A protein has these predicted regions:
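A short glycine/small-residue-enriched secondary-structure motif
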Residues: 58-67, 75-82
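Major-groove recognition helix of helix-turn-helix-like DNA-binding domains
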Residues: 72-91, 101
Length: 392
């Protein structure tokens, strides 16, 4: 099926054309486009992100140099940077947000049976935010401090497959806890989050009352009393497993039910952590291991920023930046889609890290990664000796 196709066209062939057209038609965009459609824009932006282009001029130069191969990648022509800049400024970023929702509905079921590291029946999600810094002089709309600009990307990640289930883009000045109001909470699901999201009023109303669970870290100034304490095996690192009640003036009213606090010492670093949860059933060690899984959302943010080049933007308006982020998320989901439907054994991290080097090759994608790409420990051969893999 993929014989004779470039790696890039194999990935982009997974785009559901009818659904993409529906997203475009919803915002009545293409009727104004002459020689550069929304599909053309998506392909060019995805190619630029996968190959790490750092400016509009760099994109133009790259496409010009590859002009003889563009047709085989599905790209019509070497689009001038001014044309791309105008499209990024004018075309509604919601097109690509809606398309990301379409892709997620197609991709997520493919990962539903993936094994989670912990043997749990519950769905497990990690929720976190990442601040993306912007130049205040170029992006005055993104001001959040006197001399700084930026936006926040609040993301809920399904840890079976590390897929972004929900993404909210806000000003960097927006408090993290307010993003909880946008979440759809699934009964019985477990939500992992850092202590920046500890708002007992919200945790009780949005999660506990909906029969879902949370695991977070207790703040140092939390006021509470111990109701009971369970026996623990301290050789596992668990120091204590306590039932507590909040005693703060407001917190005692906001969250009147008992909570569970598991205190854990990491022997490797000698650091002590206090984990807070409303789950009374799982073993104390499972609670601490669950919180460790929250770092998967950090890996997702690192991937999005480094491997899809969100650290360099191709426009300065709010629309252009939001558009680039959503196309990056769509590209991530297409890679996740390709991994499953093309039966690729390598991790998404390995695929994304290396695929940009081979986009114009005509090797079947699954052959490239299942036979040629080594493991994480031995993949240095893919990079020129002048560079370290950490630079990419």
């Amino acid at each position: 099926m993929n014989k004779g196709k470039t790696i890039f066209s194999q990935i982009m062939s997974l785009i559901p054309e009818r659904d993409f057209k529906t997203c475009v038609d919803r915002y009545k965009v293409n009727y104004r486009a002459r020689n550069f459609s929304c599909k053309d824009q998506f392909l060019v932006m995805s190619y630029a992100q996968l190959t790490g282009r750092d400016s509009l001029r760099d994109i133009e130069n790259c496409l010009t140099a590859l002009s003889s191969k563009l047709y085989h990648c599905g790209i019509s022509y070497a689009v001038p940077r001014n044309t791309l800049a105008k499209a990024n400024e004018k075309r509604d970023w919601h097109i690509y947000k809606d398309f990301a929702d379409v892709l997620l509905k197609k991709v997520r079921p493919l990962y539903a049976k993936d094994k989670f590291r912990l043997d749990l029946d519950n769905m497990v999600y990690a929720f976190d935010s990442s601040t993306i810094s912007l130049c205040l002089k170029l992006c005055p709309w993104a001001k959040f401090r006197k001399n700084k600009g930026g936006i926040k990307m609040h993301t809920l990640v399904d840890l079976r497959g590390n897929l972004p289930v929900s993404v909210y883009l806000t000003s960097a000045s927006v408090n993290d806890v307010k993003a909880l109001d946008n979440l759809y909470i699934e009964p019985s699901a477990i939500y992992l989050m850092d202590r920046g999201y500890v708002d007992f009023n919200r945790l009780f109303k949005l999660i506990t009352k909906k029969n879902a669970f949370f695991v977070t870290r207790a703040k140092d100034n939390m006021l509470f009393e111990v109701v009971s304490e369970a026996e623990v095996d301290k050789s596992t690192g668990i120091i204590s497993d306590e039932r507590i009640k909040l005693t703060g003036l407001h917190t005692a009213k906001w969250y009147s039910e008992e909570l569970r606090m598991v205190t854990y010492e990491d022997y490797a670093t000698n650091k002590v952590y206090r984990f807070l949860t409303n789950n009374m059933e799982y073993e104390a060690l499972t609670i601490s291991e669950l919180y460790r899984e929250r770092w998967n959302v950090e890996l997702y943010f690192k991937w999005i920023k480094q491997h899809l080049h969100i650290k360099s933007f191709y426009g300065t308006s709010e629309n252009a930046i939001y558009l680039q982020i959503w196309i990056a998320i769509c590209t991530y989901l297409l890679l996740a889609y390709a991994k499953k439907v093309m039966h690729i054994d390598q991790s998404l991290h390995t695929i994304s890290k290396n695929v940009g080097l081979f986009l114009t090759d005509k090797t079947p994608l699954n052959d490239l990664f299942n036979k040629a790409v080594p493991t994480e420990e031995t993949e240095d051969w893919l990079y020129p000796s002048l560079f370290s893999p950490d630079d990419f």
